[in-house]
């Protein structure tokens, strides 16, 4: 079930403070965050946000198409190594 429209999008307060400081100061350094649950707001457009994927921070450059999605959608947590090869087919 999706979030109620009357509540509005969720974004962590500490992330909003960092974004406001970056926009006001014209700082180009990536904003580090562990908040994968935060919704991308229009204020984030043009910023690089380093989202934690459980192991490291993945830089995500925010564009207009990303608004309304969650930050965690753009930092993949699982690495796919490929399926096991069939030993009979190799011979």
UniProtKB/Swiss-Prot annotation:
It comes from the Bacteria. The keyword Ribonucleoprotein applies. One of its GO terms (biological process) is ribosomal small subunit assembly. Pfam families: Ribosomal_S19 (PF00203). GO terms for cellular component: cytoplasm; small ribosomal subunit. Keywords: Ribonucleoprotein, Ribosomal protein, RNA-binding, rRNA-binding. GO terms for molecular function: rRNA binding; structural constituent of ribosome. Gene3D superfamilies: 30s Ribosomal Protein S19, Chain A. InterPro entries: Ribosomal_uS19, Ribosomal_uS19_bac-type, Ribosomal_uS19_CS, Ribosomal_uS19_SF. NCBIfam families: rpsS_bact. Protein S19 forms a complex with S13 that binds strongly to the 16S ribosomal RNA. HAMAP family: Ribosomal_uS19. Belongs to the universal ribosomal protein uS19 family. This is Small ribosomal subunit protein uS19. It comes from Cupriavidus metallidurans (strain ATCC 43123 / DSM 2839 / NBRC 102507 / CH34).
């Amino acid at each position: 079930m999706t979030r109620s429209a009357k509540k509005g999008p969720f974004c962590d307060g500490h992330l909003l403070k960092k974004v406001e400081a970056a926009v006001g100061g014209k700082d180009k350094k990536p904003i580090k965050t562990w908040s994968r649950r935060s919704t991308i707001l229009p204020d984030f457009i043009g910023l690089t946000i380093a989202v934690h994927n459980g192991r490291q921070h993945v830089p995500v450059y925010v564009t207009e198409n990303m608004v309304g999605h969650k930050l965690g959608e753009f930092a993949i947590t699982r690495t796919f190594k490929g399926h096991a090869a069939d030993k009979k087919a190799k011979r």
